[in-house]
């Protein structure tokens, strides 16, 4: 996005995979890379898991650039455990970051988007949410929640030219680097970014859609209903 002229707020609390701790250098490293390549970016280190954190992220954008046109909900943590052994300490933080985090950031941005009659919201779901994955009842519930979140925003944002879509990416990231093994070499995040750039573009006319993306492949995902029968 920065290479195409977008002015970026890089938010990253810099916590561990399970959400513990923080490290301001995570966001600053990306900002430095963007600036070195000739782009513009500022860092923000707030947690998306609180309303105050979400408001601060959007305020950073308004203070730096005067408006907010694009929100990409991409924060995530993992606390995997089989359902038999899962307790609220594994569920609540995951819901707070993935699902409530998307709400906390998008809600203050939505006010500006409605007023200006334009906005693009891209949320990050997962195959674990859409199709399910062993040991991830918490994560899957949060990620499928983002599908419903996205489709409602698409409906409510239509008359304000706000488009909302969701991606289910497969990529090697700081969160997944210890999970993928050799296949991770073929899953560079740069193979995901083109669809994000497209969904964020002013010419993009789709809304309420789900896209699976990774390794150079993009596929539309949909929820279907059979013809059914009448008794």
Predicted ranges, named:
Residues 3-4, 112-115, 131, 147, ...:
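Active-site-adjacent segment of SDR/Rossmann-fold oxidoreductases
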Residues 24-28, 45-59, 88:
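The beta1-alpha1 cofactor-binding region of Rossmann-like NAD(H)/NADP(H)-dependent oxidoreductases
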Residues 34, 82-83, 90-95:
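Substrate-binding pocket helix/loop in short-chain dehydrogenase/reductase
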Residues 37-40, 60-73, 79-82, 118, ...:
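A glycine-rich helix->loop->beta "capping" turn
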Residues 106, 142:
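Active-site helix of classical SDR
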Residues 126:
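Residue(s) in the substrate-gating loop at a strand-loop-helix junction
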Residues 166, 184-231:
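C-terminal helical subdomain
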């Amino acid at each position: 996005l920065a290479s195409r002229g977008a002015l970026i707020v890089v938010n990253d609390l810099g916590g561990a995979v399970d959400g513990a701790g923080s490290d301001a250098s995570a966001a600053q490293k990306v900002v430095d890379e963007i600036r070195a390549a000739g782009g513009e970016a500022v860092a923000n280190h707030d947690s998306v898991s609180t309303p105050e954190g979400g408001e601060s992220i959007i305020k950073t954008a308004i203070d730096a650039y005067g408006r907010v046109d694009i929100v990409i909900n991409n924060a995530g943590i993992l606390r995997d455990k089989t359902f038999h052994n899962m307790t609220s300490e594994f569920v609540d933080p995951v819901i707070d970051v993935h699902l409530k985090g998307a709400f906390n950031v998008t809600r203050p941005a939505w006010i500006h988007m409605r007023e200006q009659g334009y906005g693009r919201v891209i949320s990050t779901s997962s195959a674990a949410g859409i199709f399910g994955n062993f040991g991830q009842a918490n994560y899957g519930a949060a990620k499928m929640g983002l599908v419903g979140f996205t489709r409602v925003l698409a409906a409510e944002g239509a008359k304000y030219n706000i488009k909302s879509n969701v991606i289910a990416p497969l990529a090697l990231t700081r969160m997944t680097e210890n999970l993928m093994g050799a296949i991770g070499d073929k899953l560079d995040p740069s193979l995901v970014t083109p669809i994000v750039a497209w969904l964020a573009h002013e010419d993009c006319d789709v809304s309420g859609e789900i896209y699976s993306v990774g390794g150079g492949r993009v596929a539309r995902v949909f929820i279907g209903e059979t013809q059914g029968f009448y008794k």
